[in-house]
């Protein structure tokens, strides 16, 4: 896939970013390199690999799934919020 101005404008809109006109050529080149790298990865034959393949000897260690709450952490985080109520952040509405 070739990155052109049309694709870059669509990416800007989707990401809510604005790329300065002086940087657009550079960004298009970088994105093209990234897509080229992904194309190389897509060409790799991974048929012989198990879907759960791990590079760690013995696999990934499991841990017990025990929920825990530390109320001081939540209180500490909420204390830094501009506005909160009943253990929730209050944010501006984004959908009308």
Curated annotation (Swiss-Prot):
Pfam families, A to Z: GatC
Catalysed reaction, written as an equation: L-glutamyl-tRNA(Gln) + L-glutamine + ATP + H2O = L-glutaminyl-tRNA(Gln) + L-glutamate + ADP + phosphate + H(+); L-aspartyl-tRNA(Asn) + L-glutamine + ATP + H2O = L-asparaginyl-tRNA(Asn) + L-glutamate + ADP + phosphate + 2 H(+)
Domain of life: Bacteria
Entry keyword Plastid: no
InterPro entries: Asp/Glu-ADT_sf_sub_c, GatC
UniProt signal peptide: none
Any one of the GO BP annotations: regulation of translational fidelity
GO molecular function: asparaginyl-tRNA synthase (glutamine-hydrolyzing) activity; ATP binding; glutaminyl-tRNA synthase (glutamine-hydrolyzing) activity
Swiss-Prot/TrEMBL keywords: ATP-binding, Ligase, Nucleotide-binding, Protein biosynthesis
Keyword Transmembrane helix carried by entry: no
Known EC number: 6.3.5.-
UniProt record similarity statement: Belongs to the GatC family.
Oligomeric and partner information: Heterotrimer of A, B and C subunits.
Classification via HAMAP family: GatC
Function: Allows the formation of correctly charged Asn-tRNA(Asn) or Gln-tRNA(Gln) through the transamidation of misacylated Asp-tRNA(Asn) or Glu-tRNA(Gln) in organisms which lack either or both of asparaginyl-tRNA or glutaminyl-tRNA synthetases. The reaction takes place in the presence of glutamine and ATP through an activated phospho-Asp-tRNA(Asn) or phospho-Glu-tRNA(Gln).
The name this protein goes by in its record: Aspartyl/glutamyl-tRNA(Asn/Gln) amidotransferase subunit C
Source organism (scientific name): Sulfurovum sp. (strain NBC37-1)
Phylogenetic placement of the source organism: Bacteria, Pseudomonadati, Campylobacterota, Epsilonproteobacteria, Campylobacterales
